[in-house]
Regions:
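Non-catalytic, alpha-helical, charged scaffold/linker segments
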Residues: 1-52
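Glycine-rich beta-alpha loop elements in corrinoid/cobalamin-binding modules
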Residues: 3, 8, 12-15, 62-196
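Compositionally biased, intrinsically disordered low-complexity regions
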Residues: 26-29, 58, 67, 167
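Short, compositionally biased "basic patch" segments
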Residues: 34-75, 85-86
Length: 196
């Protein structure tokens, strides 16, 4: 990889500096990692341009999750036809659902770039497996959904837990098993009589 005749090179390589100077003779591995990263960034740009405008290796549709003050753009995008990347993601989800047959599926959403994929999966689950309950937690809900009032998000998930997820998850499981009332849920948003 360091010899630069193994991977194709596109626009990210136009900005490349003198690698020998930057990494020296002892930095072959670091240099190879840097070149591989540039290749992956070029590949991501290509996929975004040609296949799916929301693509990102770890941040799918990140710009949609960044506008936490309004759910409108994200809601509209969730109702558009799926892209080939989303179709692949949903096919993987279907395999896991058929393999494990869960009654509860939870999504960890640490960053804005994980929100769209989690909601898209939740939407698909609600359409194809309406008896499965769907939970969501993680860093993004902790910071951006703390004061959620838009009930539309609950078309895609049933529960949003905040902060340390263990206690809310245990209470959610107790609630779903019929051992406690919904009012006993800890740090968890849900709809009760169409109100968050």
């Amino acid at each position: 990889i360091s010899e630069r005749n193994f991977l194709p090179e596109a626009s990210k390589f136009e900005q490349i500096e003198d690698l020998e100077w930057a990494f020296g003779t002892m930095g072959i591995r670091d240099q190879a990692r840097h070149i591989a990263t540039l290749y992956l960034e070029d590949l991501s740009d290509f996929i975004t341009e040609v296949v799916d405008p929301h693509f990102g290796f770890s941040r799918y549709a990140e710009r949609l999750g960044m506008s936490a003050h309004s759910f409108d753009a994200l809601y509209d995008e969730l109702h558009k036809p799926t892209t080939s990347i989303a179709d692949h993601m949903l096919a993987l989800l279907k395999q896991r659902i058929e393999e494990y047959k869960p009654s509860l599926v939870c999504f960890s959403v640490p960053f804005p770039g994980n929100l769209f994929a989690a909601l898209k999966c939740g939407q698909w689950l609600k359409q194809h497996y309406p008896d499965i309950r769907i939970g969501m937690g993680g860093g993004y809900p902790n910071t951006e959904l703390r004061s959620i009032s838009d009930a539309r998000v609950f078309q895609f998930v049933d529960y949003i837990s905040l902060d340390d997820g263990e206690a809310p998850m245990m209470e959610l499981l107790n609630y779903l098993d019929g051992h406690i009332d919904v009012s006993m849920l800890k740090r968890t948003f849900c709809l009760v009589d169409s109100v968050v």
